[in-house]
Design a protein with these regions (language model features):
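Short, cationic-aromatic polyanion-contact patches
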Residues: 498-501, 550-560
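Short amphipathic alpha-helical interaction segments
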Residues: 528-542
Length: 560
């Protein structure tokens, strides 16, 4: 515990002794928000606000402070004689001046006015402590020239402590407000078409609907393995079989795979399935939807993303998978078998392994040489059958499927099919996936016999799509990392700091700065008795924080 934290806890106890509850249970009747008061300023109007103290300037019997609420910040003015009308001035002199800190949350009743320099301000008539903060905020520092430094900007700290990020970096909150607006725009777009929003299981007996490595867990009561869903596709198609002709879900999916700026193991996807439609119809719908999202969020179809100008105005370019590969590599792979594909991968220095079948080899070529080329929205259409085990065979080419993926800024944003509804063909495709699994492909699909059974009862012609919402939100908010658009991105847990005494901390901190050194010389730098020193070194050795060894001449000590 730091000195500041100790002081704040002492203030907490002082408040309690004065009969002030630092964590009151009753509601505080907020009637106003900071930005609204500034934008719709009314002289001398009564206001009730609440928020966190972000700065204070105490000048004897008066003080200016800044309060931050959910919408922004506003200046407030504390005057002792306004707050304390009778002879007892303790609420200002003791509670406000001495026992409150930056970071505390308070409620305020007051009136609006403008200072001599014209700044809109709340004159505090009364205040109430709503929460006593026990840790100081890591606020940026300002040097003598007014330059700000040491801001809360370290990426790892921001992601690990998103609550602080939201308090200290106002632009972060704006990203997540926009995230909700994007999701609501999509939901309204689909609801106006009378499509039905549904929920399907997250824990599944078979991880179906995509080629991906699943997370596995165990259900104790049923004594069976269960998987976190990698996709909700098969369940939504079962609903189409059941007669629900248009269904969608904002799905939380989980894939036990790598992490980078475009991937998080837990992510959000929109899945939509509409009966009696095909992939051409779905392309039109997708264009309309994404164009609308862009306009609703930005007021126009063109946005600046990183250093690029991206235009979301429909219609979007369309190019087949094979044509795209030929355009950017010079190879026509449309008639190549697995061995030929493996050879040209080697020729182009594309990393492959023996577990990869034809579909994954083609995907590797496209991913390595093509996808980064598509900046403006582009539909990649007509995928090989080996890459699309859930997709209907192309109506004019039996080696292809009616599938498209939407690429924007070199990222896959959406994946869509004319859905395979032939149960015999579907079972054969699943069996081919099973063979890939035997070869070592840990992303190969499982066979879902209940899904096959549902198809045998009959699923109407259907088109389906999955849109990666996190990536779409990245684009629309000009963020280059998926972690920026997730409240709590996945992070490796920090090793818990061992609990040690304050004296042991002093010894350890000094040793960590020195590194390995002579035990007796290091010991002489502290004013501890031999008994105390033995106790401290034992404490640190038991926690595996230091090691003591002997060479030919000396006893050595070093941090672990």
């Amino acid at each position: 515990m730091t000195e500041q934290e100790k002081i704040r806890r002492e203030k907490l106890e002082e408040l309690k002794k004065l009969g002030v509850n630092p964590y009151p249970a009753e509601l505080f009747p907020i009637n106003n928000f900071s930005i609204d008061l500034i934008e719709d300023y009314k002289e001398n109007s009564k206001v009730t606000i609440a928020g966190r103290i972000m700065s204070r300037r105490i000048q004897g019997n008066a003080s200016f402070a800044e309060i931050q609420d959910s919408k922004g910040r506003i200046q407030v003015y504390f005057n002792r004689d306004e707050i304390c009308k009778d002879n007892d001035k303790s609420k200002y002199n003791i509670i406000y001046k001495k026992l409150l800190d930056i970071g505390d949350i308070i409620g305020i009743n007051g009136r609006m006015f403008k200072t001599k320099v014209g700044e809109i301000t709340v004159l505090v008539k009364d205040f109430k402590i709503l929460n006593k903060s026990l840790r100081p905020l890591p606020l940026p520092k300002v040097d003598s020239d007014g330059n700000e430094y040491d801001s809360f900007s370290d990426l790892e700290q921001r992601y690990r402590h998103r609550y602080l990020d939201l308090i200290l970096n106002s632009q972060v909150k704006d990203i997540f407000v926009k995230r909700t607006k994007i999701i609501n725009t999509i939901r309204n777009f689909l609801n106006k078409k009378s499509y039905l929003e549904v929920e399907t299981p997250i824990l599944q007996p078979i991880p179906g609907g995509a080629s991906a490595r699943p997370f596995i867990t165990h259900h104790n009561a049923l004594d069976i393995p269960l998987y976190l869903r990698i996709s909700d596709e098969l369940f939504l198609k079962k609903l189409i079989v059941g007669g629900l002709e248009a269904v969608y879900e904002f799905s939380r999916d989980f894939r036990n795979e790598g992490m980078d700026k475009n991937h998080n193991p837990e992510f959000t996807i929109l899945e939509l399935y509409v009966a009696y439609k095909d992939y051409f119809w779905m392309m039109d719908l997708t264009e309309s939807l994404i164009e609308k999202v862009c306009i609703e969020l930005n007021g126009k179809t063109k946005i600046q993303y990183d250093s690029k100008l991206i235009d979301f105005k429909a219609p979007y370019e369309k190019i087949s998978m094979f044509d795209a590969i030929k355009k950017f590599t010079g190879y026509d792979i449309s008639r190549m078998d697995e061995n030929e594909l493996r050879k040209i991968c080697n020729d182009m220095s594309i990393e492959v392994d023996e577990s990869m079948g034809e579909g994954k080899l083609i995907d590797a070529i496209f991913g390595s040489k093509c996808e980064k080329k598509f900046i403006n929205p582009t539909f990649i259409i007509d995928y090989p059958k080996s890459m699309s085990p859930l997709t209907k065979q192309h109506r004019s080419n039996p080696n292809l499927t009616e599938r498209f993926e939407l690429f924007i800024n070199g990222m896959e944003i959406a994946n869509a099919y004319s859905e395979l509804n032939d149960p015999i063909d579907q079972l054969e495709r699943f069996e081919n996936q099973l063979e890939l699994g035997k070869k070592g492909d840990d992303e190969a699909m499982f066979i879902d016999m209940d899904f096959i059974k549902s198809l045998e009862y009959g699923m109407p012609p259907t088109s389906g799509i999955g849109i990666g919402l996190d990536r779409l939100i990245m684009l629309m908010t000009n963020q280059t990392s998926i972690q920026e658009v997730l409240f709590f991105p996945q992070m490796k847990p920090l090793r818990n700091e061992p609990v040690i005494s304050n004296d042991a901390k002093i010894v350890l901190n000094k040793l960590q700065k020195k590194g390995e050194c002579d035990f007796n010389i290091f010991k002489s730098e502290f004013d501890f008795s031999n008994k105390k020193w033995d106790k401290l070194t034992k404490e640190l050795r038991v926690k595996d924080l230091i090691s003591i060894s002997k060479n030919e001449n000396n006893l050595l000590i070093k941090p672990s």
